[in-house]
């Protein structure tokens, strides 16, 4: 039986995960810091997972939508960066937090920023990914070399990130 984290109307498989959003270190830090839902290690990859029930359509040229889309992109980038910094502050001992007993960290992980959008068309994922890639600060890309993925609920289920609706 898998550990589950319920976020944005989806049930995420949370084996080998640190629920950073629910952690004491995050709760005690106060305003001004945003975080992803959780960090999951799967196949020596640190996945910083952000979940959304919906997201502005990247193909809608309406000015109001463009503003909402850019604002959403900015917030997601901020969450990825803040979460990476908060996680590393725990890793090097600046911030104190106790990881779950089953949270085992690889010695040489790679890094993925993963955005899962529940109600999102397949063809909308790529433009969101491209925009996130473009908006991540250059120094983050140079230092950490993260891969960015944007997937919907169907793809997340196929890739083993969420419990399939058929399995519920």
Predicted regions and their residues:
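Basic, amphipathic N-terminal segments that precede the first structured/catalytic domain
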Residues: 1-36, 165-168
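Short, flexible loop/turn motifs enriched in small residues
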Residues: 32-33, 41-44
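Conserved catalytic cores of phosphodiester-cleaving nucleases, focusing on short active-site segments
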Residues: 38-40, 47-53
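Structural motif
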Residues: 45-47, 112
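Catalytic cores of nucleic-acid endonucleases
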Residues: 54-114, 138-143
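Short acidic, S/G/P-rich loop/turn micro-motifs used as interaction or catalytic elements
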Residues: 54-57, 119-125
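Polybasic (Lys/Arg-rich)
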Residues: 122-168
């Amino acid at each position: 039986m898998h550990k589950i984290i319920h976020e944005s109307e989806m049930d995420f498989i949370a084996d080998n995960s640190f629920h950073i959003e629910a952690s004491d270190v995050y709760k005690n830090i106060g305003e001004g810091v945003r975080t992803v839902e959780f960090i999951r290690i799967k196949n020596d990859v640190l996945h910083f997972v952000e979940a959304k029930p919906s997201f502005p359509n990247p193909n809608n040229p309406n000015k109001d939508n463009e503003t909402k889309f850019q604002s959403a992109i900015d917030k997601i980038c901020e969450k990825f960066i803040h979460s990476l910094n908060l996680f590393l502050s725990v890793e090097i001992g600046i911030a104190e937090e106790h990881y779950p007993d089953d949270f085992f960290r690889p010695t040489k992980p790679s890094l993925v920023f993963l955005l899962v959008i529940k109600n999102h068309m397949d063809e909308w994922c790529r433009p969101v990914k491209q925009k996130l890639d473009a908006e991540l600060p250059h120094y983050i890309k140079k230092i950490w070399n993260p891969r960015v993925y944007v997937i919907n609920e169907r793809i997340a289920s196929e890739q083993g990130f969420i419990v399939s609706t058929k399995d519920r």
